[in-house]
């Protein structure tokens, strides 16, 4: 069906312009992906308690379209919260590799972002970004659930921006 805009009444033209939008397939996929993130929780220390609070009725992460998954094969976001030891590093990498593409990582808390108070220990990895690429860093010891929700919203913005521009946003 072809619509000739010149033949329409001005009010009809305005109404039609309000109800039609143009987009690319990549932008549509980015919008859909950003509004249906399925995070996999990987809690290693006290930050995990705050991460669990996001799933409670007070914060209700479900209202943002995000549902916690227990399997990496069903997840597209890995939230690493807590101290990552060198013994745990291969497991983090294996879980990341099992996630389907596209996949994103959120480092939650001082320990996950830079080693935290245990940074000088021989057994602690100095940031999960040495094992897997991190998309969003959430500082704090421990960060509160509102900070995690803010970080998830920042990840959504990043996904939409990358879909719109076609440019990969990196933290390095």
From Swiss-Prot:
Top-rank taxon: Bacteria
InterPro entries attached to this UniProt entry: NADH_UbQ_OxRdtase-like_20kDa, NADH_UQ_OxRdtase_20Kd_su
Matching SUPFAM superfamilies: HydA/Nqo6-like
GO-annotated molecular function: 4 iron, 4 sulfur cluster binding; iron ion binding; NADH dehydrogenase (ubiquinone) activity; NADH:ubiquinone reductase (non-electrogenic) activity; quinone binding
Positions of [4Fe-4S] cluster binding: 46-47, 111, 141
Required cofactor names: [4Fe-4S] cluster
Subcellular location: Cell membrane
Topological relation to the membrane, as annotated: Peripheral membrane protein
Pfam families associated with the record: Oxidored_q6 (PF01058)
Enzyme Commission no: 7.1.1.-
UniProt keyword list: 4Fe-4S, Cell membrane, Iron, Iron-sulfur, Membrane, Metal-binding, NAD, Quinone, Translocase, Transport
Catalytic activity as recorded in UniProt: a quinone + NADH + 5 H(+)(in) = a quinol + NAD(+) + 4 H(+)(out)
Cofactor, free-text remark: Binds 1 [4Fe-4S] cluster.
UniProt-listed GO biological process terms: aerobic respiration; electron transport coupled proton transport
Any Gene Ontology CC annotation: respiratory chain complex I
Record PANTHER family: NADH DEHYDROGENASE, NADH DEHYDROGENASE [UBIQUINONE] IRON-SULFUR PROTEIN 7, MITOCHONDRIAL
Binding partners and assembly: NDH-1 is composed of 14 different subunits. Subunits NuoB, C, D, E, F, and G constitute the peripheral sector of the complex.
Family: Belongs to the complex I 20 kDa subunit family.
Function: NDH-1 shuttles electrons from NADH, via FMN and iron-sulfur (Fe-S) centers, to quinones in the respiratory chain. The immediate electron acceptor for the enzyme in this species is believed to be a menaquinone. Couples the redox reaction to proton translocation (for every two electrons transferred, four hydrogen ions are translocated across the cytoplasmic membrane), and thus conserves the redox energy in a proton gradient.
Protein name: NADH-quinone oxidoreductase subunit B
